[in-house]
Amino acid sequence: MDWRVLIVLTPLLIAGGWAVFNIGAAALRQAQQFLSKQS
């Protein structure tokens, strides 16, 4: 595997993982608020 591919993909994977982490955290917060309003 070419090392240049890794140099290009690594920041993209880090950014993608960070976005998923942030979106997941916000979704969990909203779900908890929704569930607490229901009860």
From Swiss-Prot:
Coiled-coil residue windows: none
UniProt keyword terms in alphabetical order: Membrane, Photosynthesis, Photosystem II, Thylakoid, Transmembrane, Transmembrane helix
Signal peptide range in chain numbering: none
Source organism, top-level taxon: Bacteria
One GO biological process term: photosynthesis
Transmembrane segments: 5-23
Family label: Belongs to the PsbY family.
Function: Loosely associated component of the core of photosystem II (PSII), it is not always seen in crystals. PSII is a light-driven water plastoquinone oxidoreductase, using light energy to abstract electrons from H(2)O, generating a proton gradient subsequently used for ATP formation.
Full protein name: Photosystem II reaction center protein Y
Gene: psbY
